[in-house]
Amino acid sequence: GGNARSWVQLKPELPQMADEKGIIFVCPDGKNSWYWDSPENPAYRYETFVTSELVKYTDGNYATIPDRKARAISGLSMGGHGALWSAIRHKDVFGAAGSMSGGVDIRPFPQNWEMNKQLGEFAANKASWDAHTVVNQLDKIVNGDLALIIDCGEADFFLEVNKDLHNRLLARKIDHDFITRPGGHTGTYWNNSIDYHVLFFDKFFKK
């Protein structure tokens, strides 16, 4: 798993990119939360933290533009799920969102990454798992609500769930950038992904 330093470790030039683009990068530590407000663990309120508390703190302490049109959210792996989860459910807060190698459908992986601590065991809590996966949140948005970029490596174990998300977005006629490139669930892949996401968000901010 990653932590608050992961992006800078993957992309040491991130501070220079921030200066060049005039972008503030805020990197919270999501632990193993999947960025949910956990129905099983009341101590885990990461959706509230990221979409409300952290946004208010950042706007109150840094020279931000406090508007959804100047705010984007992205992440890798669990964070890719978290970014889309947060933006789709809080499109009043974020104007753009991205996922790199995101676990956008958690249900094929019921024994992985301590998700059962947040949602309960899959077999006994299928409805909760269905309700807490990104691919089942798309009814909350229509085309134009969010600028979306989604990418995943062709050797990544999350590739198929990302293709499914892409097809569901197409079926709903929701515009999005969808990229697959050679690579796996690795830092080398994400180092390049960050470049694409920053470019995408920079163009969004300048609209």
PLM-predicted stretches and their roles:
Residues 1-207:
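Non-catalytic cap/lid and distal C-terminal segments of serine-dependent acyl enzymes
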